[in-house]
Design a protein with these regions (language model features):
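Flexible, glycine-rich surface segments
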Residues: 40, 47-52, 56-155
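Short N-terminal secondary-structure initiator segments
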Residues: 1-15, 105-108, 112
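Structured segments of extracytoplasmic/periplasmic soluble domains
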Residues: 12-15, 29-36, 63-67, 89-97, ...
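Extracytoplasmic/secreted proteins, especially bacterial periplasmic and envelope-associated proteins
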Residues: 4, 8, 21-28, 52, ...
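Primarily short, surface-exposed interaction patches in extracytoplasmic proteins
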Residues: 5-40, 62-70, 74-77
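Extended, non-catalytic structural segments that build the interaction scaffolds
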Residues: 34-49, 167-171
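Extracytoplasmic/periplasmic, Sec-exported soluble proteins
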Residues: 1, 17-21, 45-53, 75-83, ...
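C-terminal functional modules
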Residues: 138-191
Length: 191
């Protein structure tokens, strides 16, 4: 976004029901400026203060941004390597398990009644398979012990997915199932 982060946070800090949160983010943004990480004019972001390519809030930048290129400070505004390394650091610190899948698309057998399945109830993969969930031919390596949840993002009749703990980590970055599915599916394509 092209909004001044300082102005956006200052406005929200006093004109929002979440004022205390935005005031603390404003203080974090001022710390970033004080460190010389970016100029006030360059510190742009969303209307809510999310900054740079990864859309980090200032407090997240201070905790997790990475100077991958070795320029002396993380540059999430114009450096793609710094941005990608910062996102990877965010996911790692949020509990990402390298080598484990985020999830997989599955086919529901005729005996499965999706309306009766609690989307918050995780079960081992083997339990889902015994209930009639079928894996697709190009599914990731099976992790029989990983807890999996069944989600139907488009409702009954739409696509079905078993999602593993790494899916929850993606949702810590953005709490939308649609966002997390998009990231997971795109990641599968590029790897």
């Amino acid at each position: 976004g092209g909004f001044s982060v300082v102005q956006a946070l200052a406005t929200l800090g006093w004109a929002s029901h979440r004022g205390a949160y935005f005031r603390s983010e404003l203080i974090a943004a001022l710390h970033i400026l004080d460190r010389g990480a970016i100029s006030p004019q360059g510190m742009t972001g969303s209307y809510a203060g999310a900054m740079g390519q990864p859309q980090f809030m200032p407090s997240v930048y201070l905790k997790l941004a990475v100077d991958y290129e070795g320029q002396g400070r993380p540059n999430i505004w114009t450096s793609t390597p710094d941005s990608l390394a910062s996102i990877a650091n965010y996911l790692r610190k949020s509990g990402w398990h390298a080598g484990e899948p985020w999830g997989e698309q599955v086919v529901l057998g005729p005996n499965i009644q999706p309306a009766g399945i609690d989307p918050d109830q995780a079960q081992p993969l083997g339990s889902w398979l015994s209930m009639g969930v079928r894996r697709l031919p190009r599914a990731p390596a099976a992790y029989a012990s990983l807890p999996a949840r069944l989600i139907l993002p488009d409702g009954v009749g739409g696509d079905s997915y078993l999602v593993y703990p790494n899916f929850k980590v993606i949702r810590r970055y953005n709490p939308s199932d649609f966002y997390a599915l998009s990231v997971g599916l795109l990641g599968d394509i590029v790897t």
